[in-house]
Design a protein with these regions (language model features):
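Outer-membrane beta-barrel proteins
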Residues: 26, 43-45, 57, 100-106, ...
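Residues that define the transmembrane beta-barrel architecture of outer-membrane proteins
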Residues: 32, 49-53, 108-114, 128, ...
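Acidic/polar loop-and-plug regions of large Gram-negative outer-membrane beta-barrel proteins
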Residues: 159-179, 252-269
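Short loop/turn motifs that connect adjacent beta-strands in outer-membrane beta-barrel proteins
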Residues: 21-32, 63-64, 123-130, 203-209
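Short glycine/proline- and aromatic-enriched beta-strand/turn motifs that initiate or cap beta-hairpins
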Residues: 20-70, 74-87, 91-94, 269-296
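Gram-negative (and chloroplast) outer-membrane scaffold detector with strong preference
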Residues: 58-176, 184-193, 201, 294-296
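Cleavable N-terminal export/targeting peptides
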Residues: 1-30
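Predominantly the C-terminal beta-signal and adjacent terminal strand-loop region
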Residues: 204-296
Length: 296
């Protein structure tokens, strides 16, 4: 009889503890609360929407429904320098250049993403909360670049056994608007739609971490990109300049201006076709995210 009473008491105690644990775990789950979270994409790939991070806010209407608003900003700059030797002696031994050049390329990109969506929280087990939903919004990518080429060389000219050496300095600078230096990426404006599913794990009553996986369709247009080139050539024999001219070109107008800095009578202008890089696009990609948030 004593053993039976002890076993019954132990069973009641266990059930009581289990019930308390369940109630405590339920307290971790949101109910009509507001959360703020920081999310980032841990992977790197070409169509990655936001390169840095995104800030999301969620408002829980009830235990199963939440609306959310997110703002993401990404910024990236890369710089590349290329050194090259100049030697055209093998082409013409009587008139060749020898020297070196340095090319510096700097690409800059900015990404802006703004979206609003709905979440349906369909299951929870203690501290784990599972959800799915959809989101729509604006996604823009902005590109710009600069390229500078500095070359110094010596022209070696031999005529009838007489050799003349001339110092030459060339500088070229390019400014790219709405594209990168290779002109294979152009500024984009578009809308996106995402269906997603995710999970939250509540570490403490107001702190959670989570993961999300979405399938995104992005549609929009690319902007008409343009670039300008300024080229200065200086040819110096001793202390005297024999050439000093500047050439400028704009792809937006298709006009090239040639300015002779030593003799303005040689100035001239030529016209070419203006370029147009505007186009429409549709992209589909998978978008993973790691999240950490706080409940208010």
């Amino acid at each position: 009889m004593k053993k039976f009473i002890f076993a019954a008491a132990l069973s009641l105690t266990t059930l009581s503890l289990n019930a308390q644990t369940t109630e405590e775990d339920k307290d971790y789950l949101p109910d009509g609360t507001f959360t703020v979270e920081w999310r980032f994409n841990p992977f790197s790939y070409e169509s990655k929407p936001v390169n840095v991070a995104q800030l999301n806010g969620r408002l829980f209407i009830n235990e199963t429904s939440a609306v959310r608003l997110g703002i993401g900003v990404g910024f990236n700059t890369d710089k590349d320098e290329q050194k090259q030797n100049i030697n055209s002696q093998s082409v013409n031994a009587n008139n060749y250049d020898i020297g070196n050049s340095l090319t510096t390329i700097k690409n800059t990109s900015l990404t802006l993403k703004v979206g609003a969506g709905y979440e349906y929280h369909f299951a929870n087990t203690g501290r784990l909360d599972f959800y799915g939903g959809g989101e729509v919004g604006y996604l823009g990518r902005f590109y710009s670049a600069t390229k500078t080429i500095n070359a110094t060389s010596t022209n070696v000219l031999t005529i009838s056994g007489t050799t003349t050496k001339t110092q030459i300095a060339d500088t070229e600078s390019y400014d790219y608007s709405n594209s990168n230096a290779d002109r294979d990426k152009f500024t984009e404006h578009g809308i996106f739609g995402t269906v997603f599913t995710g999970i939250d794990f509540y570490i403490y009553r107001k702190l959670y971490v989570g993961a999300e996986l979405g399938l995104t369709v992005n549609a929009g247009t690319t902007s008409n990109a343009s670039w300008t080139r300024n080229k200065t050539h200086r040819s110096v024999v001793g202390a005297n300049e024999t050439e000093n001219w500047t050439e400028s070109f704009s792809s937006e107008t298709g006009i090239t201006n040639y300015v002779d800095n030593l003799n303005n009578n040689n100035n001239r202008q030529s016209a070419d076709y203006a370029t147009d890089s505007s186009d429409s696009f549709i992209k589909v990609y998978v978008e993973p995210a790691i999240r950490i948030g706080w409940m208010f």
